[in-house]
Amino acid sequence: ELYSLPFNMYTFNKMWGVVTPEEAKAKIEEQRKEITKEPENLEEQAISLVGRDIYEKLIKGYTEKQWGRDCRELPAFIIKRLPVRLTFDNNYFNALYQGIPVGGYTKMVENLLDGIEVRLNTEYLENKEALDALAEKVIYTGPIDAYFGYELGTLEYRSVRFETELLDQENYQGNAAVNYTDRQTPWTRIIEHKWFEFGKDSEGNDIPKTVISREYSSEWKLGDEPYYPVNDEKNGALYARYKKMAEKEEK
């Protein structure tokens, strides 16, 4: 089955057969009533926002793959709100003007960095003193616990692994990204890269082959690439302690 995301009238029509915003809203409101108290976990929070059907079909499996935990073990505050559109607008973003840089983001960043010194394969924390001496203000974008040598303990992160494959076919899935929201499929989504630039080469010709990447979410351990932090109360409290240490930094 294929559903349109974010949740919109195409989604609700496929799931329930409803054809008007009033019908869709009534269906969601009916199912939201299942939760009668303050949500205590992510499952209850999601159902209180969009109902049982959408939760089971499009949220539960994907979320559990993403976090590696049962939704009932995840805190409710992870989901503040779930966008629901009672229109047939299935665009992911709401911005009036949307686009992708011609040639991709790598080319755009290369242009931005033209004339700026860039050092590759250089570990900041291993060369901190020398690198700090180069500027009056330093912007560090790595893990905050690593910055302080894990002095207070290690924050929990999730990592992501990609399997990329070149296929001898012109069109694999007809879309740049397809999420797999069931729990059984091991990957969270498949990216078909050519559709980010509309499947054409630099001269505007169709490309006869395609490249796909399967994305897998996994537990993180030291040495892995941390993609996003585990957002729960324990890690939030530890982060707050590290943040206080960071506020005392002079540079």
Which residues fall in each region the model found?
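Mid-domain catalytic core of redox enzymes
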Residues: E1, L125-M245
